[in-house]
Amino acid sequence: DTYENIFTSAARILLKEKKGLDADSFSEELQSIVVKEYSSNLSKAAVNRAIDWLHRAGIIGFAGKLTGCDILSYKAKARVFFMDLGLTTYFLTQTGCTPGDIQGVVNENFVFLDLRRRILFPREIALETPAFATWGNYEIDFYVKSIKGQHTYAVEVKSGKNSSWTMEEVLEKKKADYIL
């Protein structure tokens, strides 16, 4: 089933991806996985139609990418998230990943959904979609700029209490006003 394969492949992308996509877009990354692992007769157009349908149906959502914590470097559709945490958990389980990995991705997905809500009316944060950022060779799970106050926040989704070196450096270099 094409959609089942797309769901599972999207879950794999969520698991492996920490710096954006290898390909130029989520659809190219997804197509390469689906074609390689499931069916070589699926065209790019067919994969794009399936992705568009899933997005319009509210099943998946996209996050952008900010290079160097620069709000002006926004690149759309750099990462995909499921719009339902039950789907997220189900398809991550189908990939065979560990419970710890599932919990980490579900936590990040939850934050994505909350940030997405804050972009909708009444708008609280900037950008078209929630976005992650890169800083050197590292990733910041989400980078947010408030509409009111214009403050920037580097958000790291963790299950523990320790802050990462990357977050401290981002704050020290004044790439974000606050770290969460």
Question: For each predicted feature, which ranges?
Answer:
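Hydrophobic/aromatic beta-strand patches that form the interior of the parallel beta-sheet core
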Residues: 81, 153-155, 178-180
